[in-house]
């Protein structure tokens, strides 16, 4: 988990967290007083405790968020090409919900670009699973060869990492990265977002059905997509209510503008 924030005392956060294994650094997408806290990789209850520790430290030292800030979640995931193809289509299907439960600034953000502006359902389905990496990199680079693709996958920095769903991270370091969420120092918001992402990843890994995913894409409105996701992912009522309430909140903001 990478938490971006602005406006506080960088040195105090560094002194509090660096010795506990957290990464603490500046971020080029933020102002000079910006910070990125990288929560150590962990599982289960420990993730919850570490995220809470980071959020409390940021708030204690005066940090908040602006529309420049994002929340990036990395989750270790199997890298078999067929599974990656399924995950790409499922994330494409979920994107309207992801953007609808976040501020409009995320949709128009250079650092979390939507898949649906560069990919189509048809091309994802028709692409051979063994060439899904080539399809992903082709959205930023012309005249790709397999040699170039192999080179890209060994490099830390690549322009394709700025999609809301960053497959480059999986090819490079075996973690999928989701960049859709707006910046927050709320421990509860972060953990609910992680719970939703994990439910999606588990579905793709163990219960994936392409026809179900296509039906999700065909749902005519965000609320119907959320209700369909609840059934598909077996989401509990509190998480579903949270997602719906965020959708209503940001829809009202849009209507007021």
What does each model-identified segment do?
Residues 1-65, 78-257:
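C-terminal accessory/tail domains of diverse enzymes
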């Amino acid at each position: 988990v990478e938490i971006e924030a602005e406006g506080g005392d960088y040195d105090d956060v560094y002194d509090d967290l660096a010795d506990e294994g957290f990464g603490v650094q500046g971020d080029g997408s933020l102002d000079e007083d910006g910070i990125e806290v990288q929560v150590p990789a962990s599982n289960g209850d420990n993730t919850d405790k570490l995220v809470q520790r980071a959020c409390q430290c940021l708030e204690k030292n005066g940090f908040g968020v602006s529309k420049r800030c994002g929340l990036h979640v990395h989750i270790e995931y199997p890298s078999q090409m067929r599974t990656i193809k399924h995950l790409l289509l499922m994330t494409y299907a979920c994107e309207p919900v992801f953007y609808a439960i976040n501020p409009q600034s995320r949709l128009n953000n250079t650092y979390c670009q939507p898949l649906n502006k560069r990919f189509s359902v048809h091309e994802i389905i028709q692409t051979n699973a063994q060439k899904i990496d080539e399809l992903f990199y082709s959205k930023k680079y012309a005249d790709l060869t397999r040699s170039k693709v192999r080179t890209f996958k060994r490099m830390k920095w690549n322009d394709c990492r700025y999609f809301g769903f960053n497959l480059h991270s999986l090819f490079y370091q075996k973690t999928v990265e989701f960049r859709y969420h707006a910046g927050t120092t709320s421990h509860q918001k972060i953990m609910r977002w992680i719970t939703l992402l994990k439910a999606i990843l588990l579905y793709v890994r163990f219960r994936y059905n392409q026809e179900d995913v296509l039906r999700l894409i065909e749902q005519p409105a965000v609320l119907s997509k959320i209700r369909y996701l609840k059934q598909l992912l077996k989401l509990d009522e509190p998480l579903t209510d949270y997602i719906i309430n965020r959708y209503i909140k940001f829809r009202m903001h849009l209507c007021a503008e």
